[in-house]
UniProtKB/Swiss-Prot annotation:
Family: Belongs to the peptidase S46 family.
Domain notes: The C-terminal Lys-rich domain (711-818) is dispensable for the proteolytic activity.
SUPFAM superfamilies from the UniProt entry: Trypsin-like serine proteases
Protein name: Dipeptidyl-peptidase 7
Organism, scientific name: Porphyromonas endodontalis (strain ATCC 35406 / DSM 24491 / JCM 8526 / CCUG 16442 / BCRC 14492 / NCTC 13058 / HG 370)
Annotated GO MF terms: dipeptidyl-peptidase activity; serine-type aminopeptidase activity
EC number: 3.4.14.-
Keyword Hydrolase: yes
């Protein structure tokens, strides 16, 4: 450990990256440049660009899918088998669960295709095509006189372009902005709507650790679930039919049993949802104060009410499990983000960037071109602060907090439903009521109303408070009881009867319904608040667009990947642990031992079924084990955010080694500021997934369906066998370079940081022991006159003699005297 620390210190002094340093960013595969690719090869990537990404052809990326409405998945067999996270499949598993068949608690396994469960409403999307439509957008907006007009033009043209690429419900085109609105692509997908549940572990595995461990390392969660995509007889996307057959994909991922070592190449491909890496300091403050803070307060109160009821009743737990998980995920994310932004002093980092931008403007006499950008953003953020906070409080409380307002919206829309659409409308309502409890929501409503009264500006509050004050003397609890006693909206049976009435009778009932009255008060309040903020928000978007474009001109060599927007991206890096704080170090993997250390039968988050504990205790890990242990989760320094859940993690050969499911607590600020020393992706080891499928679910037919890759196990490779080189400070290297006991491997961590010119060490001689070793040359960085890396003999000392030759000690003494 001490030697590693010394090496790292030398590398930092030299200003040369180590092999384990990822490139910041979520890269567009269709824009992958030579610089990216060369760096990927340095880190250990072995495939060609075409093998990585080639739409319509077999490639690594062709097997990656959008799973549902906000996750990623990976195709792993020639019969449409999909691996994704347990929390991504959680809603699907919950939808099939009952008290008698509790698949959340007990897990699910199918013995054949017939037993696989269709999931209504679930879809999987395969990327079909990406087309640059920027010229069409730019030509259309050229004459726009305002940001509002510009937005309307883009929206209308986008709808037209979408229609050009969309074919029914199975091929969908979506125009999407990139680079802060400076570029536009239409992204086209094949949409498969017959997706079936194949296998899911018990929640004690798939959700082990619950909210306590969410966003945390160490982790011991088997966060995976298994689905299958079905297609019609011609292998085309289709709606559900018993006649459909398993989909034959263009590509599917090989699954590696060979493991990984620290420093090994790791790559994720997925659909990250949203990042804001190019915000100004005022934008960061807006996120902290006006977005995250309302979310933290409101969801904390709502979730406490839900949790008490869920722990008291099994049926309630099943109904609200998915809702609670979705709510708490971003509640804890917001807490961690605010903490991280403060700890990393991100606001002042952004201010430093702004000062550099202003200095560049002054140096280039560009005040007339760019001088308005930052002052405009500062002013617009200041104007929008109060209304932004009001909007977020209204959304979190009365729109997203209590459920009755949106139910009232749906019931109230009955008059606009055409006869042909009525069956679909009734089916949607039935799904909503299936997981709704009026007895619980009646407790949430007054809590949400109280927050609105306390936090939202008086002129933005819904006028329902006048009624509450007049009739109930301000008591929100009495008002809530009144709503739930007098309204038909909270009760599925009453709504069902209501839908069978003539239209005139329906209107009379709705006109008098107190829940509908609440909806008719809340909606205008939100819309009015949005109207007030719209111009300011559009001006902010304009400023962000201009700031991004100008920043690229200021520093044309700076790599500025587009922010995430739920389109396909790649992140490359290495398997790597991290230091969460001074004096602490987190290992890069966990094992089954941690389950025994954490498990607690008295805790709903850490209770594990005896059969699972017995299975792990038996150590019958077979081909999935590492010695007498089973690796459960691991870390890599890939870039991750929401939407990446379920993203495949590939090794340098394009083989699946894990499924990404989380980020770490110390780097929750990563959506705004990527911190390479801290930011880590948490993934479930694919061998834990296979172990549960094989040994727990006893589904050998699924294991046979996979393309398993077996070879030398990376985890156990000794020195000289493709693991640690025999060179005393080398960390990783290619097998062929170390198989004969060479002291140095091509592109090893030591040699990259050690060579005078920064290039990889390619020969044994370059790393041999003695005065001329690359290892020793690294020490010369400290003898530089200006403290910068040694790049030539003249730079090292005043004498101008050799950087690391016989005069090394003399050079060092001269430098120290200076």
């Amino acid at each position: 450990m001490k030697l590693k620390r010394i090496l790292l210190s030398v590398a930092l002094l030299c200003g040369i990256g180590t092999t384990a340093m990822a490139d910041k960013g979520m890269w567009l595969l269709n824009e992958l440049n030579q610089q990216n690719y060369e760096r990927m090869k340095e880190l250990g990537f072995k495939l060609s660009p075409e093998q990585l990404y080639s739409l319509g052809q077999p490639s690594v990326a062709s097997a990656v899918v959008i799973f549902g409405g906000g996750c990623t998945g990976i195709t792993v067999s020639n019969e449409g088998l999909i691996f994704t996270n347990h929390h991504c499949g959680f809603g699907a598993i919950q939808s099939q669960s009952t008290v008698d068949h509790d698949y959340l608690r007990d897990g699910f396994r199918s013995n054949n295709h017939v037993e696989e469960l269709p999931i209504p409403g679930l879809s999987v999307r395969y990327l079909r095509e990406i087309v640059d439509v920027t010229p069409r957008i730019e030509a259309a907006v050229k004459g726009a006189k305002s940001e509002m007009e510009r937005m309307q033009i883009i929206e209308e043209l986008s709808q037209k372009i979408n229609a050009e690429y969309t074919k029914g419900s199975t091929v969908v085109g979506e125009v999407t902005p990139y680079y802060a609105g400076n570029k536009y692509y239409v992204v086209v997908y094949n949409v498969f709507q017959d997706v079936r549940l194949v296998m899911a572990p018990p929640s004690s595995v798939g959700k082990f650790g619950g909210d306590t461990d969410n966003w945390m390392w160490t982790r011991h969660t088997g966060d995976f679930s298994v689905f299958r995509v079905y297609a019609d007889a011609n292998n085309n996307p289709a709606l559900y039919s018993q006649n459909n057959k398993p989909y034959k994909p263009i590509s599917y991922a090989p699954v590696s049993l060979n493991g990984y070592r620290e420093g090994d190449y790791a790559m994720t491909i997925g659909f990250p949802g949203s990042t804001n890496r190019y915000l100004t300091s005022w934008g960061v403050e807006d996120v902290v104060n006006n977005e995250n803070s309302p979310r933290i307060e409101v969801r904390g109160i709502k979730q406490a009410i839900w949790k008490e009821a869920m722990e008291a009743d099994q049926a309630t737990r099943i109904k609200y499990a998915s809702k609670y998980a979705q709510s708490s995920n971003y509640w804890k994310n917001s807490i961690g983000m605010n903490r991280g932004l403060k700890n990393l002093d991100v606001v002042n980092r952004k201010r430093a960037e702004e000062k550099a931008f202003e200095a560049w403007i002054a140096k280039n006499n560009s005040q007339s071109t760019y001088g308005h950008i930052l002052p405009g953003l500062k002013a617009d953020y200041a104007k929008s602060a109060a209304i932004s906070k009001d909007i977020n409080y209204l959304y979190e409380t009365l729109w997203g907090g209590t459920e009755i307002v949106r139910l009232a919206r749906d019931v109230n829309s009955v008059g606009r439903i055409q006869a042909a659409d009525m069956p679909k409308y009734k089916g949607r309502l039935e799904e909503l009521y299936k997981d709704y409890l009026p007895s619980l929501d009646v407790k949430v409503l007054p809590a949400m109303l109280d927050i609105v009264r306390q936090r939202v500006s008086a002129d933005c509050q819904p006028d329902i408070f006048k009624f509450i004050d007049k009739k109930f003397k301000g008591s929100t609890e009495k008002y809530a009881q009144y709503v739930f006693e007098k309204s038909i909206v909270p009760y599925a049976d009453k709504v069902k009867d209501f839908l069978n009435l003539p239209a005139d009778k329906q209107k009379k009932i709705l006109d008098k319904d107190p829940a509908v009255a609440l909806f008719n008060s809340v909606l205008p309040a939100i819309m009015q608040a949005q109207d007030k903020s719209e111009e300011m928000m559009l001006n902010i978007e304009k400023g962000k667009r201009e700031y991004f474009a100008a920043s690229r001109i200021m520093d044309p060599n700076r790599q500025m990947p587009s922010d995430a927007n739920f389109t396909m991206r790649m992140s490359y890096g290495s398997i790597k642990g991290y230091a969460p704080k001074d004096g602490a170090w987190y290992n890069y993997y966990t094992t089954e031992q941690g389950v025994f250390e954490k498990q607690d039968p008295t805790s709903s988050e850490f209770a594990v079924q005896p059969e699972i504990l017995s299975l792990l205790r038996s150590k019958d890990f077979g081909q999935y084990g590492v010695g007498d242990h089973l690796r459960l989760c691991f870390l890599s320094d890939n870039d991750i955010t929401g939407g990446n859940s379920g993203s495949p993690v590939f090794n340098g050969n394009g083989e699946l080694i894990g499924l990404a499911f989380d980020g770490n607590w110390e780097a929750m600020s990563g959506d705004i500021e990527f911190e390479p020393d801290l930011q880590r992706t948490i993934s479930v080891d694919i061998r834990y997934v296979l172990f549960m499928i094989d040994k727990w679910a006893k589904m050998p037919h699924l294991i046979k369906e996979l393309n398993l890759v077996k070879g030398d196990q990376r985890d156990l490779m000794p020195a000289g066998k493709g693991g640690n080189c025999s060179h005393k400070k080398a960390q990783t290297c290619a097998k062929k370079e170390c198989s004969k006991g060479k002291k140095c491997a091509e592109k090893s961590a030591t040699c990259i940081s050690a060579m005078k010119d920064g290039k990889p060490c390619k020969t044994e001689k370059a790393c041999a022991a003695g005065q001329k070793s690359a290892e020793k040359k690294a020490n010369c960085c400290s003898t530089m006159k200006d403290g910068k890396p040694c790049t030539g003999d003249k730079d090292c000392a005043k004498s101008g003699k050799a950087c690391c030759g016989k005069n090394k000690e003399a050079a060092a003494k001269k430098a120290s005297k200076k």
